[in-house]
Amino acid sequence: MALLELSNISYVVKEKSIIRDVSLSVHDGEYLTIVGPSGSGKSTLLKLCSDLISPTSGVITYNGRDLATIDPESYRKEVGYCFQRPYLFAKTVRRNILFPYDIRGMEPDMIRIKYLFDLL
C-alpha cells in the first residue's frame, strides 16, 4: 500500500486547470523529485499533498485513508514539505536529485536516475 497516493487529481482556479488528472504513489522510504518549468504546477501539487488546498476532483489518500477525512492538524504533524528556493539549492538538476542520497551517505540507483534524466 502506498503511503501517499494521488488518484486522478485536478485543481482548477477560475476555470483555469492548474493540475489535470495527476496520479502517483509514494511508498514509505521513497524519494520523490518534482521538476518542471515555472508555472507548471509543482508548488500547487505540493500544497495539495500537504493538505493546504483541496483538489477540485480526485482523491488523495494517506496510509489508505482519504485525506479529506483526516484531521489536518494530526496529518501535518506527520507530513511536511519544503519548497526549493533557488539561492538555497542553487545546484544542477542532477545535484538536486542526488541530494537525498548524499545527505544520508547512500549509493544512488544510477539506472533509475538515468531514466529520470532521460525524461527531462
Question: Which functions belong to the PLM regions below?
Answer:
Residues 58-66, 75:
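Conserved ABC transporter NBD signature motif
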Residues 95-110, 119:
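ABC-type ATPase nucleotide-binding domains, specifically the catalytic core motifs of the NBD
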Residues 35-37:
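The feature captures the beta-strand-to-loop junction immediately N-terminal to the Walker
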Residues 86-95:
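Conserved catalytic motifs of ABC-family nucleotide-binding domains
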Residues 50:
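Helix-to-loop junction immediately C-terminal to a conserved catalytic motif
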Residues 32-33, 81:
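Short beta-strand immediately N-terminal to the Walker A/P-loop
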